[in-house]
């Protein structure tokens, strides 16, 4: 069984790669029947252990800045669509700052008689009513979800499923992003708003609890399985440091977007 890991670490986010990779090699799908293929989209000239592990595929990816690094992540994945179809049976996207903390196996693999999708409940909306979910509420957006709809609020940081099903998700969301862009709309929470819309229409076969996206330093009523490392910790440089590389370009883009919206 071939498991594809989709991972983006442009700019200074490559600081998270080594520990993510080592934790995956220790805890994620370590049964001998699984082969892990790492598809790492980065502008870094070198990745930890790539010279020793032929299953680490470094794919050149420029830093798109905010919000495109998240909004267009599905466009990024589809750049290697044919390769993913050839080389994987399952695909999972993990945010750069995640860390596996205990063994994970077949419980994350949707069955062949399901729609083949997996989503993860956002820890900030655990046990909250859907009246508190911050879905996209603008009717003009492709991510629009009406009040009263939606059973869960899904996080953007971990999703996946059978390769065919997940690539269909990527294709559909890309078309939505492009349609919104043509109408000068950016969904409120970017890719997360769009994935919530997709999962409303196509409820995932597996919905993981927030134990699989457990924010560092939080107190939730379960043991963390995958930790969200705190970007503000000194060893990572802090949130502003991680985004600083493209800060000027981001400001220029935001000004341009405001001008377009004002026209």
Per-segment meaning from a language model:
Residues 1-72, 80-87, 250-263:
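N-terminal anchoring/stem segment of glycosyltransferases
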Residues 10-12, 45-47, 63-64, 98-100, ...:
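Short, solvent-exposed loop/turn segments at secondary-structure junctions
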Residues 40, 91-95, 118-120, 160, ...:
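A structural signal for short, well-ordered beta-strand segments and their strand-loop junctions
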Residues 145-232:
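Catalytic core and acceptor-binding pocket of nucleotide-sugar-dependent glycosyltransferases
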Residues 226-263:
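Long, low-complexity C-terminal extensions of enzymes
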